Swiss-Prot record:
Organism superkingdom: Eukaryota
Organism expressing this protein natively: Caenorhabditis elegans
Topology class, membrane: Single-pass type IV membrane protein
Role according to the record: SNARE that may be involved in targeting and fusion of Golgi-derived retrograde transport vesicles with the ER.
Lumenal membrane side: 250-254
Alphabetized UniProt keyword annotations: Endoplasmic reticulum, ER-Golgi transport, Membrane, Protein transport, Transmembrane, Transmembrane helix, Transport
Stated name of the protein: Vesicle transport protein USE1
């Protein structure tokens, strides 16, 4: 469950209250919805400074845009003009998730559960109402009215199916984005580890080269020292031999 700021919580509460107003009685609450959208836009401007809302600000803006267009459509005089405004509402965008937890401490969290109003439901309901009004202006028979009601219900059903599909696609896209981001982090971490290991190999190779040079110099020095010792021993033995020979020849001559 995500933790949100106090400003975002206030925004979500007002957003859901406004959506309920449009569902209850749009014609009677149009001025309230219009005023609420202005406040919501100001609150979105404040939320731009909150880094935790960057990923969902676009969805917030689309939700507020829909409410603004619903209020604008209701203020039009004819059903045809209302339908034109309704068609401006984005057909595909996910509902804002408003089941959240607000916590100032890590140990305490207060949960806030909202009664969610579907964006597709609001849009489909108002469009159905305006379509019905337009048909009533053109067709007055009971037969046509019954047929229009059936068509409106089918239209709302199709709208909800499309919205559910759009939400599923949006969820899959977010999941794919998260997976790609995680894979990128893993690849980056592995690359850094490989670079570090390559550096360690180079350092070890350099250290081994230095150590080999030291061993080579030490071996050369040891060989040179051994040669000097052997030369000294040879000279000493030659000297001793000469002394012995001199003594032997001296005794022989006497």
């Amino acid at each position: 469950m995500a933790y949100i700021s106090e400003n975002e919580l206030k925004f979500l509460r007002l957003l859901e209250r406004t959506k309920r107003l449009t569902k209850e009685d749009m014609s009677a609450n149009v001025w309230k919805v219009s005023a609420a959208t202005k406040i919501l836009n100001k609150m979105i401007y404040t939320l731009q400074n909150d880094e935790t809302t960057n990923d969902i600000l676009h969805e917030y803006r689309q939700e507020v845009l829909q409410l603004k267009l619903l209020a604008e459509a209701e203020s039009k005089s004819s059903a045809e003009e209302r339908l034109k405004v309704i068609e401006k509402i984005p057909r595909v965008f996910p509902d804002v998730q408003v089941t959240v937890a607000d916590s100032k401490n890590d140990n305490e969290a207060e949960s806030y559960d909202f009664e969610k109003e579907s964006a597709a439901g609001l849009r489909a309901t108002q469009r159905s109402i305006y379509r019905s009004d337009l048909r009533k202006q053109l067709l007055s028979s009971n037969k046509h009215r019954a047929q229009d009601t059936s068509e409106d219900q089918e239209f709302m059903k199709n709208e909800l199916v499309e919205e559910e599909l759009a939400n599923s696609l949006a969820t899959m896209a977010r999941s794919f984005k998260t997976m790609m981001s995680a894979a990128g982090d893993v690849i980056k971490e592995d690359t850094e580890r490989a670079i570090l290991m390559a550096k360690e190999v180079d350092d070890n190779k350099t250290a081994l080269g230095i150590q080999s040079e030291r061993v080579e110099r030490h071996a050369y020095k040891c060989g040179y020292d051994c040669f000097k010792v052997m030369l000294i021993v040879l000279i000493f033995m030659s000297f001793v031999s000469m002394v012995l020979m001199m003594k032997i020849f001296k005794k022989a001559s006497t």
